[in-house]
Amino acid sequence: MSNLLLSKIGHVISEFPMAFKQTKEVKLFMTLLVKNEEGMLEENLQFHKAMGVDGFIITDNNSTDSTPDIIRKYKQKGWIKEVIEEKATNYEQKDWVDRMIWKAKTIYKADWIINADADELWYAPTGNLKDELYATNANVLNCEMRSVYPEEEKPFWQWDKTVKAVTEPEKYDLSLYSLFERQNKKVIHRTAGYLQISMGNHKVTMFPQKSADSHIHVY
């Protein structure tokens, strides 16, 4: 059994009383694993900061465009709390995201975490992602993903046409991985009780675990 796993188990045991506790104050962090995201990273940071995210941890995996410049800009502004420059050429997404979660939890004392991609916008109907976090006694929130139809003449954050899922995509000769397929939900989770994130950030292992569907949507 690895030292990290032993440490996680120790934390889970000590945090048991906090597993489902409602709190009046929430520190919300977002992790981002990026590579060559100059076309969307800045808008992503600005959008989620306005939605209530308190801090970002970013892993940059060998970007060769202006992504590092954008990261430095928002590190200097204090929005990005830590940057990990990952030089590996294999894609260990689950391990790299887990590393960011662990830092957010143990170093920056985050209460809740969103593990996002640079091309995702996590939207709360109330205008603040924290509103639902204050009220829930769950420790995992399942968030519906909604595909957005690309519009060449607009930047991605201005696309406003959502795609309705097709129930029988093979009937229309559509790929099972197309925009028209129903997307798997993604999760927001507490740090208390955290054990492991899944590949793609669609599931998380917690102990104990109590999940609930969320009004937050991912576009």
Give residue spans per PLM region.
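N-proximal low-complexity "stem/linker" segments adjacent to membrane-targeting elements
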Residues: M1-Q46
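Catalytic-site signature of metal-activated, phosphate-bearing donor transferases
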Residues: S2-H11, D95-V97, A124-Y219
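Short, acidic, metal-binding catalytic loop of nucleotide-sugar glycosyltransferases
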Residues: Q46-G55
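Short acidic/polar active-site loop segments enriched in Thr and Asp
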Residues: D54, D111, N139
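Short beta-strand/loop segment that forms part of the nucleotide-sugar
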Residues: D54-N62, V83-E86
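Active-site-proximal specificity loops/subdomain of glycosyltransferases
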Residues: P68-W112
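Short beta-strand-to-loop acidic/aromatic patch adjacent to the donor-nucleotide binding site
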Residues: K109-Y123
